[in-house]
Amino acid sequence: RTLAWCGAVVAVALLVVVLMGWRGAPPEDFAHPGGRWSWWGSVLAGLLAAYAVFQVSVPGRSLAWAWLPMPAAIAWFAGMGWGCLAQVRADGGAVALGLGSWHCALAITLVSAPMLLVMLLLVRHAGVVRPVPTTVLAMLSAAGLSSAAVSLVHGHESALLTLAWHGGVVLLLCAAAW
């Protein structure tokens, strides 16, 4: 099931790249402080959360699998936090959220919604076993991989804006699942 999920993620990412345009490789976000940590952390968090969700959703499997993506998720958010601190320092202590970019919100929505729907389809029967961990891990997987995919088509934003969008949505969805 994890391989099926990865195939669906690649298909969605390719479709979004075709529709929105490729930025080139590697993403310029890697040049910003914390950019590599954030990108690789999001990819690893997404993949590990996918594997974990398919483990915790099987009756008799340990709930400890739910902790598998946590180090990668911490690296992802730490990378964004590092970018925020570097940006505040570069701006002389000013905190600029840069809310003018609705293109960023559109890109996040166009990438994450199909990924989340596919993941929820893959675990639709598993919700009976452990509904909260299954939902939280499914959302973390979709959020992590969509964050990485968005960076392929959308330029660097304010690190604080990125943290607010991705971090806020992950926290909101996890709270809603609880």
Set out the residue ranges of the language-model regions.
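Alpha-helical transmembrane segments of multipass membrane proteins
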Residues: A13, G46, A50, G79-M80, ...
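C-terminal ends of transmembrane helices
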Residues: A50-R61, V118-G127, A177
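Select subsegments of transmembrane alpha-helices in polytopic membrane proteins
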Residues: L3-V12, A107-I108, T134-L140
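Generic serine detector
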Residues: S38, S42, S57, S62, ...
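Non-cytosolic membrane-interface motifs at loop->transmembrane helix junctions
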Residues: F30-S38, G93-L106, S158-V169
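Selected alpha-helical membrane-embedding segments in polytopic membrane proteins
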Residues: T2-A96
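Terminal transmembrane helical module of multi-pass membrane proteins
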Residues: L120-W178
